[in-house]
A protein has these predicted regions:
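Bacterial Sec-dependent N-terminal signal peptides
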Residues: 1-37, 248-251
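Extended soluble regions of mature proteins
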Residues: 32-251
Length: 251
């Protein structure tokens, strides 16, 4: 009896995944393509520290109990062509009780434009660029997130040196997601970063019959902007500098 080899098995899995995505997209094509998603961002501070600085002993650190796990919320508004992602200010506070810094991500698929307005450690960065392509690898793993059946995909983040795992909804054929993540054949409802040290997970999904209102972030015309690549290089340098500090990373 002939047994399928690894190449044939892989081809079969690919065909099955393609069929599932095609069926889900066909089923959902007539559904709403506008709405709002609230994500909860959970940060395991100790796990993040271990990921960023694996050679440093963790027993040299001490945190208040409430600092070990940080939770915040952010909102993604989307239409068929635009998105805007922002923290929910009244629920997103830093660990000293102050308001969270700016972190707005806007995209327009029709114009192939993306804009970041991010203030980190008091420094404002404005990104105005074309939407970068993300090379995802879809796997055959599946699970439920916020009431939706999701498939898994991985992305090799060469800037931070990590493998990112995304879970996208088969019945929401819109290529968006939280923060800067996009480019899958379904809405990203969960993102796992830094070896599970930080997780973005959809908590509520509200669809709309009419397009939600989305405004592109405004900034002074003379403000210097940068490309996505330049911003990524800036973040990488910032992370490396933070690692060298006596106190290490701050989350």
């Amino acid at each position: 009896m002939h047994r399928p080899n690894q190449k044939q098995k892989k081809m079969k899995r690919t065909l099955i995944l393609t069929a599932i995505i095609t069926l889900a997209t066909s089923f959902a094509s007539a559904q709403q393509t506008s709405g709002t998603i609230v994500y909860e961002i959970t940060t395991d501070v100790e796990k993040m520290m271990k990921w960023f600085m694996p050679d440093r002993k963790m027993d040299t650190y001490s945190w208040k109990e409430e600092w070990k796990f940080r939770k915040s919320k952010a909102e993604l508004k989307f239409t068929a062509s635009e998105t805007i992602y922002e923290p929910i200010v009244e629920e997103t506070m830093d660990r000293w009780g102050g308001a969270a810094e700016e972190h707005t991500i806007y995209s327009n698929r029709d114009k192939n434009k993306i804009c970041y307005v991010i203030r980190m450690m008091g420094k404002l960065s404005i990104v105005d660029d074309s939407i970068p392509k993300m090379k995802w690898k879809v796997t055959n793993a599946m699970k439920e997130v916020a009431g939706h059946i999701c498939m898994s995909a991985t992305y090799n983040d060469t800037i931070m040196g990590q493998e990112i795992t995304a879970w996208f909804a088969l019945d929401m054929p819109i290529p968006y997601g939280p923060d800067v993540y996009h480019g899958l054949p379904g809405m990203i409802l969960q993102i796992d970063l830094y070896g599970g040290g930080q997780i973005y997970a959809a908590k509520t999904i509200t669809m709309s019959d009419t397009p939600v209102k989305i405004d592109k972030p405004k900034y002074k015309k003379k403000t210097k902007t940068m490309t996505v690549a330049e911003y990524q290089a800036q973040v990488y340098k910032f992370m490396q500098d933070m690692k060298k500090r006596p106190g290490g990373m701050m989350f």
